[in-house]
Amino acid sequence: MDAIDSVVDPLRDFAKDSIRLVKRCHKPDRKEFTKVAVRTAIGFVVMGFVGFFVKLIFIPINNIIVGAT
């Protein structure tokens, strides 16, 4: 019985903690959702520009390295 309890107790604790988390969570209102969506979009754009400029810098470097052989 002790072996079963050692498996079941962590699962029971996890389920209890999960239920408590879900009860504490709330749906964002329109203002909060808009704020999060705008910040996420800005992050995507910034990361896109970083990737674009890195690619823009490394294309000529790669051509120099490959063209030298």
From Swiss-Prot:
User: Which organism was this protein described from?
Assistant: Arabidopsis thaliana (Mouse-ear cress)
Name used for this protein in its record: Protein transport protein Sec61 subunit gamma-1
Q: Which UniProt keywords apply?
A: Acetylation, Endoplasmic reticulum, Membrane, Protein transport, Translocation, Transmembrane, Transmembrane helix, Transport
Query: InterPro entries annotated for this entry?
Result: Prot_translocase_SecE_dom_sf, Translocase_Sec61-g, Translocase_SecE/Sec61-g
Principal localization?
endoplasmic reticulum
How this chain sits in the membrane, per its record, is:
Single-pass membrane protein
Q: List the disulfide bonds.
A: none
Q: Which GO terms describe its molecular function?
A: protein transmembrane transporter activity
* Similarity field: Belongs to the SecE/SEC61-gamma family.
- Name of the coding gene: SEC61G1
Residues the record lists as N-acetylmethionine modifications = 1
Q: Which residues lie on this side of the membrane: Cytoplasmic?
A: 1-32
Quaternary structure and interacting proteins, as annotated? Heterotrimeric complex composed of SEC61-alpha, SEC61-beta and SEC61-gamma.
Q: Give a GO cellular-component term.
A: endoplasmic reticulum membrane
Q: Where are the transmembrane segments?
A: 33-61
- For the Extracellular compartment, the record's topological domain ranges are 62-69
One family from Pfam that matches here is SecE
Looking up PROSITE patterns in the UniProt record yields:
SECE_SEC61G (PS01067)
